[in-house]
Amino acid sequence: MKKNWILLLLLTFSLASLSAQDALYPNTFPLGDVRITAGPFKHACDLNVKVLLQYDTDRLLAPFLREAGLPKKAETYGNWEKDGLDGHIGGHYLTALAIHYAATGNLECKKRMDYMVSEFARVQQANGDGSICGFPNSKKFTEEIRKGNVGIVWNYWVAWYNMHKTYAGLRDAWLYGKNEKAKKIFLKFCDWGVDVISNLDDRQMERMLDNEFGGMNEVYADAWQMTGNPKYLDTAKRFSHKQIFDSMARRIDNLDNKHANTQVPKAVGYQRVAELNSKTAPDYNDFMTAAEFFWETVVSHRSLSLGGNSRGEHFPEAGKCSDYMHERQGPESCNTNNMLKLTEGLFRMHPKVEYADFYERAMYNHILSTQHPEHGGYVYFTPACPSHYRVYSAPGKAMWCCVGTGMENHGKYGQFIYTHDTADNALYVNLFIPSELNWKEKKIKIVQETDFPNEEGTTLTVNPSKATQFKLLIRYPSWVEQGKMQVVCNGVDYAKSAQPGSYIAID
């Protein structure tokens, strides 16, 4: 591709101030306020809705009903859903329904989402203690953890990781799907978790967290933001595995040969704690540094050009990237899903082009390609091994972890195209994707028309319904050469003195 980029703006607005967004994630537009209008990302999202609706909701709920002693309405799925990780896809599926309802307005997604929330309420009530678990012998697990027998985690297939998917699904049904019942269930589930680990000392917590636990620190940070209750912040910090956290906070890379997608969600949690913590808190800098250094380390030293990382699910030793050439299990899709979450979070705090550049690279080259463009199956591994190939899932047959994140991925493409900064009264254009933004607080609609990457340009049209004021910031990608970017508005090129890897401002 020629390194030449032209962006035309049709602006007819006068210029006031932004009201704060009432959202879990600051400076992020509600997913339903951004519509992708054409191109491969719209195709992927629309196709994914069709794939999601091929799954049987009752079969996904069956493990939870079984563990609560309730009659099943259908048989559970096979594969990983019957091998000890029972229920993990149910949480992912709830998130996916909520996201795709927000992204497309599909009412069947909403109907299924609301049904799952109601069923989880039944499960929680039947359990009587606030828990919602789908993995076998879950009550025994809880009893042993309460007694301090944390070694029990090794007798289960990543139980806390599994539960995290349900936590996240309930949070997302509230966040994206506007289901208030889901929030109540989520917080009650959080209270159960606080109670279960309440008698564990720091040594026991560390032993327990040696086993994969997903993003438990992330969801407890979210619970803290929802409620302001400090017990959730305390729990988020307790779920921040010190073995990784302490090294990252000291800017020490200790990731060699560690299971990659065990580590990435931890860093997502570090970022959430830093984002929500007071900058005057004594541990603020540690959480911030841990999140930033983890991102820098993985992106700059442990990722391939497509934005993915890991071989055989583990980070190779530093300097041994040749391992990728001999391993059929290349970068794992789940890892990139979580790296994009981390990138979004860091960008919310410090909107740097390097974050947007990585996001674009990983989304186009890895995440988009993990969906089969015809039947919509999902990919686990993307091998870099010469002459190798990828395997795509079939609905209801393969129930891998990357099926779960794959269900979610293709509804979130609109989440990072545009962001805003309330303090700076600014709108960021981060990605060049045909789309429409309904900026309700400003009473403005913004239309982006482009066929990127098949054409080297995009057009933004700003249509205000009232006089308003804001700063428009357009990404100058690092891959565009110096002097080759043009941002033309009313005949004026605002990019003349701009540098690659920056944002071009129109005030």
Provide a role label for each language-model segment.
Residues 1-22:
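Bacterial Sec-dependent N-terminal signal peptides
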Residues 21-507:
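Glycan-recognition and catalytic cores of secretory/periplasmic carbohydrate-active enzymes
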